Each structure stands twice: as C-alpha cells, then as structure tokens.
C-alpha cells in the first residue's frame, strides 16, 4: 500500500511541475540573431535616407540602438528602436543615456510585427531575407507614400530598390513607399 501511495504522490508532483512549467513566461524566440551594423554602414544608411531633424526613424530589430542614437545625435532626428530581446533594449537605453539623446529616442521591447510604425518617415532594417519578405506587406500597408526604407544587407525580393550601394562588405538597399 505504501508503494502505491508513493507512486501516486510522485505522479502528482510530476503533474504539478508540468503545470507550473507551462504557466511560466516563455522566452521569446528571436527570428534574427543580433549582429551590429558597423559605424560606417550606419552612417551610409542615414545618408542614403537623407535624414534631417524633421525625421522620425523606426529601426526594426534595433539591437543596441546605434542607428536611432546616431540619427538623433548627428542629425537631430527622433527615433524609435524596436527589439524583441530585453537585453538589447536595456543596452540601447543605456547607450542613449550615455550619448545624451534620451529626449529624442525611445526603445520598445516588442515583436516588430506587432508594432504600429505608421508615423515613421524612415524605417531601417538589418534583418534576414525571409523576415524582410514577411515584413514587406506591412511596410507597404502602414507607411505613407514617400516614407523611406533602408535595409542593411538584404533586399525585399522583387521590390526593386531605388538605390543600392556597397559600403565595405555590406550592401545597403533604399526604397521609397509608392503612392497607393
């Protein structure tokens, strides 16, 4: 009889651990590994987009925040960085504070597919090809005609860029959202 009770107790403990584990917050899966854009690539991305102080830049997959921070510091633009990784968001906020641009930039921990970026005048990306392709319809739907889109390294399939430049080993692609 004691063996049956012990087995039943062990079974109940196992069931409760499974239930607890299922109710714990799940770590968000990252679609894109973090790879920082080189400073010369960031500069070229902002230059090709013709950034100025009136721009609102959304960097989707912002990592350490270097693109929106550079846009704020060097061009006076405002920026929003979006990343799903809380560690990158924390790092981006620390970097913005160190560069004294917290009044110009903010960072959001969120899946980029759930963000409303319709207020952007410029969107920057350093994602993977399949993520760019998945994001493309949302860019075309949400962004106003004339909004500029710049991607480090990866294109958007059959959406031909208006400009394409090489910076070292990197290729930068530039599009403008067309009239609807």
Task: Give the label of every model feature segment.
Residues 78-83:
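Conserved SAM-binding motif I beta-strand of class I
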Residues 118-134:
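A short SAM/SAH-binding and catalytic strip from SAM-dependent methyltransferases
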Residues 54-63:
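Conserved class I S-adenosyl-L-methionine
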Residues 130-180:
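C-terminal substrate-binding/active-site "lid" region of AdoMet-derived donor-dependent transferases
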Residues 72-76:
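Gly/Ala-rich phosphate-binding loop of Rossmann-like dinucleotide-binding domains
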Residues 4-6, 11, 18-55, 86-119:
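S-adenosyl-L-methionine
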Residues 65-69:
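Glycine-rich SAM-binding Motif I of class I
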């Amino acid at each position: 009889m004691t063996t049956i009770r012990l087995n039943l107790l062990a079974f109940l403990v196992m069931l409760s651990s499974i239930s607890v584990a299922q109710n714990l917050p799940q770590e968000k899966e990252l679609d894109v590994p973090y790879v920082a854009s080189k400073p010369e690539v960031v500069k070229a991305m902002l230059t090709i987009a013709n950034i100025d102080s009136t721009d609102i830049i959304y960097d989707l997959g912002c990592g350490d925040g270097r693109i929106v921070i550079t846009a704020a510091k060097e061009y006076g633009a405002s920026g929003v960085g979006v990343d799903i990784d809380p560690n990158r968001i924390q790092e981006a906020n620390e970097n913005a504070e160190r560069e004294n641009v917290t009044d110009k930039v903010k960072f959001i921990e969120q899946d980029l597919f759930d963000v409303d970026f319709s207020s952007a005048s410029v969107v920057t990306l350093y994602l993977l090809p399949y993520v760019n392709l998945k994001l493309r319809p949302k860019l075309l739907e949400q962004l106003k005609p004339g909004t500029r889109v710049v991607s480090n390294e990866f294109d958007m399939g059959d959406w031909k860029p208006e400009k394409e430049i090489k910076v070292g080993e990197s290729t930068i692609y530039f599009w403008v959202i067309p009239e609807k």
